[in-house]
Amino acid sequence: MKHQTTRSTIFDLHGVPAFNQAFPLALQHVVAMIVGCVTPAIIVSGVAGLSEADSVILIQAALVTSALSTLLQLFPFIKTRYFAIGSGLPVIMGISFAYVPSMQSIAAEYDVATILGAMIVGGAVAVFVGLFIRSIRKFFPPLITGTVVFTIGLSLYPTAINYMAGGTGSKDYGSWQNWLVALLTLTIVTVLNHFGKGIWKLASILIGIIGGYIIALFFGMVDFSPIQDASFFQIPSPMHFGIRFEPSACIAIGLLFAINSIQAIGDFSATTSGGMNRMPTDQELQGGIVGYGISNILFSFLGGLPTATYSQNVGIVATTKVINRCVLAGAALILLVAG
């Protein structure tokens, strides 16, 4: 009886699972997205020529922004019949790679402040798209959204292959050690996901990453020096980089926000169809996209880079069927503490 109650809570959107079950599932979401979350900040800081201290602030803002954006999506603070801010769906928000090429160009020609100014304009574009999503949605039937979801999955393969090889720019990119660790990690995840039961199946990704990490330790591939040199606690610095508006940058980022707003339909649809066996409602789509826009406007003042729904975490929800908001909120809190 106790097992049935726990399962229904874990797989229920509004349940409150036990900490010992929620924490590993939350951590699984974090380890699946944290590299993708901080990498854009690292790339932008390098192109912009930021000092080490400013680079840390930008990375810190990326984590805090992702955490707060996720919490806004999970727990909408405005939700009426005709208007909502936040979807209330089990999604994870993070700094998006889709903006990286444009951000690199802007950072090289201008500065980080110009990216943040363009982000405000882009957020306003997303809010506009979200407000009219009820009318726009008819142009995206299940056939179209299904194709988008399929495309999202395919688009992750180049990123996955690069990470498996060691990460673009790595000195040992493509080495046999990298491929061995990656393939062993993949094997652990695949075996547990198909043959494991209970928490072993649900936390297959986390267990696979831990296993891969241990294997990497034996190969001497883990460097602890950055952890030793890092400060234990640091408060975020709002408006540290300032805000600047440049028309060309605003247009480029604004267009990307419009495109990502449409892609969000696919991510929200993949989340509900994969984890909840239904399509998202108009209210959920509107709240999700409006929340996406407003969070980017607000958190630009914290120095956070543009966010978007994370497809890899959508995949976790669809695979494990764990849609509990408290689990994903736990992931957001881990990101917040890390930031």
Where are these regions (language model features)?
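Structural signature of hydrophobic alpha-helical transmembrane segments
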Residues: 52-68, 109-123, 169-184, 250-257, ...
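Membrane-helix interface "capping/anchor" motifs
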Residues: 74-89, 134-139, 193-203, 320-325
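Membrane-embedded helical hairpins/re-entrant loop segments and their flanking transmembrane helices
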Residues: 19, 45-86, 255-325
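Membrane-embedded alpha-helical modules
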Residues: 106-223, 329-339
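Generic transmembrane alpha-helix signature in multi-pass membrane proteins
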Residues: 41-47, 99-108, 134, 158, ...
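Flexible hinge motifs at transmembrane-helix junctions and intramembrane kinks/re-entrant loops
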Residues: 52-59, 187-235, 240-262, 266
